[in-house]
Amino acid sequence: DRDPRRVVGSSFGVGELGLNLLFETRETIRMRRAMRTQLALAQLLCGSAAVLYAMPSVFCYNPLRTHIEVLNPDANGFGELCITMLDSHAVIALPRYATGDLGRLVSPHETAQAAAMAGTASPWLPLVAVQGRIKDRPAGLPSVESIKELLYLDHAIADELSGAFRLAKNATGGIQLSLQANQAGVATPALRAQLMDHCTRHGFAELEVELFEPEDFPWRPLLDYERKFAYVAAATD
């Protein structure tokens, strides 16, 4: 909003299909921001899922380039994204590619209504709301997206963390959230107390927080560009 000539936005791509398949615009960014303060807007785009999970990303897509479906949608309209590229000259077509991401198609009526509630122009391209990876929403644990959003709600706390964390059930059946500090000497009892208070204030009082120095974090992320960091412990861990 400060610079009419420049937009810093997110996009969504799939390695097998292409980059920038879904993308933010000024209008979708304004809509997503407004969802944080307008529950009615969040429920319009997400249904009851708005109060259970992190706010989804709101993306546009080019219907002349991609055909998007949602497989097995739930009561709120969220299901697995399925994308077909419409390029007739593609070397490998890969029709109806299921991405493993949770998404919801937004109708033109919902788009116009949401834009009006957010005080912005209605995007002229169709919208899809994306909630993150399906595998990152294990039963009995918070979603990875909700933990990321929780940590970045407080910029001062987020500045002390690397962004790597691990969710797991502990021996007593509780939920353990293990976090990696971003530098040596940061993992103090005071920061842990801040984190626990932060979790409680934002509806995650059940989390048992453990804070690690960078080199002591057992699942320390390596510079492996072939694999994504595993935020959720496997059942056998």
Task: Please identify what each model-predicted range represents.
Residues D1-D237:
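Active-site glycine/GP-rich loop and adjacent strand/helix microenvironment
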